[in-house]
Amino acid sequence: MVSSFTSAPRSGFYYFAQGWKLVSQPRIRRFVILPLLVNILLMGGAFWWLFTQLDVWIPTLMSYVPDWLQWLSYLLWPLAVISVLLVFGYFFSTIANWIAAPFNGLLAEQLEARLTGATPPDTGIFGIMKDVPRIMKREWQKFAWYLPRAIVLLILYFIPGIGQTVAPVLWFLFSAWMLAIQYCDYPFDNHKVPFKEMRTALRTRKITNMQFGALTSLFTMIPLLNLFIMPVAVCGATAMWVDCYRDKHAMWR
């Protein structure tokens, strides 16, 4: 069945909501299972451990608040918690995406075919295994782009005043953009679009992608919901690809 995803591009909020609808389509569910299992096992275990450590980490982070800002501690404490959740959530979602990258690519490919009626390459399980080195190279490209920027932002957390006020906001914006790159890259990579060209394409609709990435980042911090976010975000990003980028960048139709 060909979907009606041929209308004008919508907001990033719309595509995120579509991800929740598309992930449950009958012919798509079987491609959701493996990414979902990876995410449940890794994110579930990681966040369980995180919540056992918060009572140690948050006081440590708050100790960097200078005396002249202590009167704002009742506001800075929630910011400190959100900061830890943002950094921790993005770190482990990155690991989960590395592990599940081949299956996320397959999910994006099959959903795109479902939405457009196009015929994807007949890859199969052996095709996926053969493509793993190229997929992992692509993940390394994303990591190499992300790491130096993340290090600079993490250093800001240790600057008194800035680390408890400005740094959390900057990290949220950065993680929103990086998650948009992470999930939108699956359909782009299925069509062998170079990483640099993909980033350039996303910048042409930066607000849409920031909206999508911001919601993905927020849901990554929410217990239980974050267990399902990976396949949902892949589906939402694929819907965005079909509406916004496919006409210009598609390799197969």
Swiss-Prot record:
Keyword Phosphoprotein: no
Keywords: Amino-acid biosynthesis, Cell inner membrane, Cell membrane, Cysteine biosynthesis, Membrane, Sulfate transport, Transmembrane, Transmembrane helix, Transport
GO molecular function, one term: high-affinity sulfate:proton symporter activity
UniProt GO BP: cysteine biosynthetic process; sulfate assimilation
Transmembrane annotation, as ranges: 31-51, 75-95, 151-171, 222-242
Superkingdom, natural source: Bacteria
Pfam families listed in its UniProt record: EI24
GO cellular component: plasma membrane
InterPro entries according to UniProt: CysZ_sulfate_transptr, Sulfate_CysZ
Membrane-topology annotation of the record: Multi-pass membrane protein
Family: Belongs to the CysZ family.
PANTHER family linked to this entry: SULFATE TRANSPORTER CYSZ
Role summary: High affinity, high specificity proton-dependent sulfate transporter, which mediates sulfate uptake. Provides the sulfur source for the cysteine synthesis pathway.
Name of this chain's protein: Sulfate transporter CysZ
Taxonomic path: Bacteria, Pseudomonadati, Pseudomonadota, Gammaproteobacteria, Enterobacterales
